[in-house]
Every structure is written in C-alpha cells, then in structure tokens.
Amino acid sequence: MGGRDTDVVLLDENGIRCDGRKISETRRVEITAGVLNNANGSAYIEFGDNKILAGIFGPRDVHPKHMVRTETGILRCRYHMSPFSVSERKKPAPSRREIEISKVIKEALEPSLMLEQFPRTAVDVFIEVLQADGGSRCAALAAASVALADAGIPMRDMVSACAAGKVADTIVLDVNNEEDQAGQADMPVGYMPNLDQVTLIQLDGVLTPDEYSRCAAMAIDGCKQVYEVQKKALSDRFFGGGE
C-alpha cells in the first residue's frame, strides 16, 4: 500500500475506476485445474493480470525427519515470484515478502485440510508467480486451494480469496496494482464459503471501524464470486463442464 501521489484518476465522478471497473466489480478471473503432469495436483489462475501456477506434492514422507508429527500431517508452502514477474527484474533468492506470503498462505489453507487423516506425512504447495499485478497473495491462495482439491487431499471446504480496499476515500473491491500503490488501504481476505469461516484477514493501511466492516463484507462477497470460478475449474476438470 503506497499512498503515493499519482496523476492517474483512480475513481471518477461516475464511480468508475482507473481500469474501467465499477466499485464492487472484480477483475476477470479464470482458473484451470490439472495443468501439470508431474504434480499430484495443480492449478493455473489468471486474476486480472496476475498469472500464477500452483503445484501440489503429497501426502508424502517428511524430510527432514525431525519435522514429523505423529498425530497429523503437515502442510508446507513456498510462494515464489519469477524474476520476470514484475517490471524490474526480481532477484531469484526468496525475499522477506515471499517468505511472509508463504507463511500467510500456509496458515490460511490449514483450516480447510483434513491433515489428521495423514499422520507422519507432508503436503507441499509450490506457488510460482509468473506475472504480478496487485492481489497476488489472494490469487495464489485461490489457485493453491483448487490444486489441493485436484490432488484429492480431503478438505472441509475450499478457501477462496479476494481483497477489498480504500481508494480515493471509497471502499472498492479487488484492488489492482495501480490502486494498491496509490490507495489508502488494502484488505486481503481468505474465506471458506460453505462453512462461512474466514481463514485470512490482513490490513495494510488505516480504516475507521465502519470502513473496516464494509471492506471486510465487500471482500467476502468477492470471495464468493471467486469460489464459483474455483468450482467451475474443478467441474471442467473432472466432469467436462457438467454439474
């Protein structure tokens, strides 16, 4: 969240944003499940201009052995941005942001998984950001959840994800990169729609209590929209688009 001055009109007098969307409109979301042959499960997502690939391995033996948990399986997650994912070449080594997002996604996914059915094993989630455009952690979380379902990992529900934020003193859905850099607040949310449970909520910026409530409600509404795309991706994968 930058809060920087910008010459771009983020929100015009008709309530239209800089990319032509309305206040409560998400960017285009497309998800394809089962795109990798060598992973146990996989998914590819385009969320606006974000392009992200998620691959799953496991349940499998845990290495190193000291990480084994006798009563349950463990989830490990690596979120990585390719050097060409942003306009200025990114160094290949993991950044503090990548390490933080890896941890955030892991903790957002864990409540959805029945890891207790696979004690002494690990499920590994690998996320590769091919192109980033604001909201990549939400896009990555949504793709990872579809990939876990594609891998056949028992789940209580899928985790959907979307962000809302404050731009030009207005609460808007699904903040893009330009809005993120110049906006006032950004709130990514992870949500399990069938269970009506939030698994992730973060806030970068400052909101009043009323703005916070409206922002969270709008983000959850966005999650529900993304959830429909997630379900369609799995339906297309296993039933050829049938119900």
Swiss-Prot record:
Location in the cell: Cytoplasm
Keyword Cytoplasm: yes
UniProt cross-references to InterPro entries, sorted A to Z: ExoRNase_PH_dom1 (IPR001247), ExoRNase_PH_dom2 (IPR015847), ExoRNase_PH_dom2_sf (IPR036345), PNPase/RNase_PH_dom_sf (IPR027408), Ribosomal_Su5_D2-typ_SF (IPR020568), RNase_PH (IPR050080), Rrp41 (IPR011807)
Enzyme class: hydrolase
SUPFAM superfamilies: Ribonuclease PH domain 2-like, Ribosomal protein S5 domain 2-like
Gene Ontology CC entries for this record: cytoplasmic exosome (RNase complex)
GO molecular function, one term: 3'-5'-RNA exonuclease activity
Keyword Chaperone assigned: no
Gene Ontology BP annotations: gene expression; rRNA catabolic process
Known EC number: 3.1.13.-
This protein's UniProt keywords: Cytoplasm, Exonuclease, Exosome, Hydrolase, Nuclease
Transmembrane segments: none
Protein origin, superkingdom: Archaea
Similarity remark: Belongs to the RNase PH family. Rrp41 subfamily.
Subunit structure: Component of the archaeal exosome complex. Forms a hexameric ring-like arrangement composed of 3 Rrp41-Rrp42 heterodimers. The hexameric ring associates with a trimer of Rrp4 and/or Csl4 subunits.
Role, per record: Catalytic component of the exosome, which is a complex involved in RNA degradation. Has 3'->5' exoribonuclease activity. Can also synthesize heteromeric RNA-tails.
Protein name: Exosome complex component Rrp41
Classification lineage: Archaea, Nitrososphaerota, Candidatus Cenarchaeales, Candidatus Cenarchaeaceae, Candidatus Cenarchaeum
Designated gene of the protein: rrp41
